[in-house]
UniProtKB/Swiss-Prot annotation:
Keyword annotations from UniProtKB, A to Z: Acetylation, DNA damage, Nucleus, Transcription, Transcription regulation, Transferase, Virulence
PANTHER family according to UniProt: ALTERED INHERITANCE OF MITOCHONDRIA PROTEIN 6, HISTONE ACETYLTRANSFERASE RTT109
Disruption-associated phenotype: Leads to a decreased pathogenicity in mice and increased susceptibility to killing by macrophages in vitro.
Entry protein name: Histone acetyltransferase RTT109
Source organism: Candida albicans (strain SC5314 / ATCC MYA-2876)
Amino acid sequence: MLPPDILQNGEFETIYFQTNPTYIKSPIHIPKSTIGKPDTVKIRHFFALLHQDLVVLGLEVFVYLQIYSDFVEKYVYVSKCDTVGLEKSTIKIGKVIGPVLQYIINYNGYKIKMKNLDEKSKDLSDPSTLVRLQRLRDKLPDIYPNLPYYNDIPPKEECIEYRTLPKTQNLRLCVFTKPAKEYLFPNSAKNPYKNLLNGQSLLRWWISIIDSITKGWNNHKLMIPGADKYATRKFIEKYSDWSEGHIFKKDGLAVQAIPLFPDDPKGRFLELVIVECRYGKMTVSRFYQELAYRQEFLLGDCVSLIGCCKENLEVTYHDDSVSTVTISEYKEFMNSLKSVDFSDRVEVSNFVSNYRKSK
């Protein structure tokens, strides 16, 4: 994921894992009448950089795969990125975040199980002798399972089938930039070496990273709701293939074009539109016009939406030995992380030590 020179030949370490792919509802509303509705899976990624038992930075990314019959729509949403600042870093944060994010974007080693069928329906549809004997054995008195004869029936082995995904992908990278003192690490704002950026500096930082890892992509879009196009262009004028706007469908209803991501201002506003029963008339253009008047875009500092896309990408799926965890294990880790006081060196060091012992 990171070359040795960035890790300074072992001086820095990393934590990285992802969750097993899990079926969820589509982040974009798809009408029930749609023929060939896709299945959607979600994968959570977490990365942290360590230095001498201290956390330096962290990155959380959510990947959504919408699986159609002949292509996959892949959304990569940057959920949170944060630094700790307990010590002065000898490594540039952007030099780490760029390659890690690019790795997550390009990763195609997911093992996605076939959707589970009802176990009862599977048994009823299988009239084999083995299945009938197993049913009969279950009805026998408790004494009979202890007899050798009745235990000769081999246990039924679980057969896991994995999906074969279409080789064509459409990539969508989405980043929401908003200045904050802390995104991942509680109390880290107290630390002397944490570099807190204002909205404009944060936006420029993200654009430089994203531009470096998306060379050759079809579209690079920037939207600053509430800002005029001239103010927006100042941030992207030195990048030849960037323009003002967004990467989602321009026409139609917003609810059928704009995805709902966690802790995303677009998603929060879209949920409000749904609650107010305005989704049947809210077009995409009207949605973005009203979005500019939301409170989080009117607080004075620069808040932006970045989107990049690449169409009809031919990919090769591969097996990989990446560390995976269950959803419950992931949530347990994140809850543990959020309980740490990241202004306390001892507490942070103990957190890292406990994590290593658990592996």
